[in-house]
């Protein structure tokens, strides 16, 4: 019964015009591996890189503007950089640092290295989109910067967050897979845990 509900929910998200969810079997397989909490940090980084390689091709296949930047969200967005810099080797890379305050779940920006002049298109990298708070903060920052087209790429996202951003003009989402639920701490269920800690072997 729960499987049917989850599939139905994902189909609803897939119908949103600005959201693309990968159907590639390798992406699905690698996300299933990523859910294994016993993986070592080096294995987590390898799996995220492999998924990112497929998402990089998917998210850039319709790029038209020569004015493009890559914006990884520190710290976990850096894990997707290698794959995207191979597909877009000569575009500038700008960094935005945001962390989610644990008690309020609100995003707090602590680093912003955007230049004065914006690019027409920005590809944002953040492997997990849970509540959507961080995504909203980064999108708002880039829009205020003057960026007209935003492509937000995540390995895993919640249905709640994607529904929040449905049909926003100038913003597209390319997602590896969707989880339906969030727990009380704002983590995806079943999710992949704290992806930043898992990537770098840190503890909360």
From Swiss-Prot:
Residues that hold D-ribose 5-phosphate according to the record: 187
Cofactor mode of binding and number, as noted: Binds 1 Mg(2+) ion per subunit. The magnesium is bound as Mg-PRPP.
Protein name: Putative uracil phosphoribosyltransferase urg2
Residues noted as binding uracil in the record, renumbered to the chain: 188, 193-195
UniProt-listed Enzyme Commission number(s): 2.4.2.9
Catalysed reaction equations from the record: UMP + diphosphate = 5-phospho-alpha-D-ribose 1-diphosphate + uracil
MF (Gene Ontology): GTP binding; uracil phosphoribosyltransferase activity
Biological source species: Schizosaccharomyces pombe (strain 972 / ATCC 24843) (Fission yeast)
Chief localisation class: cytoplasm
Keyword Isomerase in record: no
């Amino acid at each position: 019964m729960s499987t049917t509900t989850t599939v139905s929910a994902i189909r609803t998200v897939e119908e949103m015009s600005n959201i693309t969810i990968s159907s590639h079997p390798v992406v699905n397989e690698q996300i299933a591996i990523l859910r294994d909490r016993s993986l070592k940090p080096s294995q987590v980084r390898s799996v995220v890189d492999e998924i990112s390689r497929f998402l990089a091709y998917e998210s850039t296949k319709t790029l038209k503007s020569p004015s493009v930047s890559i914006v990884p969200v520190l710290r976990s967005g850096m894990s997707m950089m290698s794959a995207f810099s191979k597909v877009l080797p000569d575009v500038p890379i700008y960094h935005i640092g945001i962390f989610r305050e644990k008690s309020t779940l609100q995003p707090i920006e602590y680093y912003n290295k955007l230049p004065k002049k914006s690019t027409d298109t920005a590809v944002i990298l953040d492997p997990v989109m849970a509540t959507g708070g961080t995504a909203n903060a980064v999108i708002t920052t880039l829009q205020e910067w003057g960026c007209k087209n935003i492509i937000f790429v995540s390995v895993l996202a919640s249905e709640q967050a994607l529904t929040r951003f449905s049909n926003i003009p100038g913003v597209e989402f390319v997602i590896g897979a969707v989880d339906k639920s969030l727990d009380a701490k704002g983590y995806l269920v079943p999710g992949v845990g704290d992806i930043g800690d898992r990537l770098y072997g840190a503890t909360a």
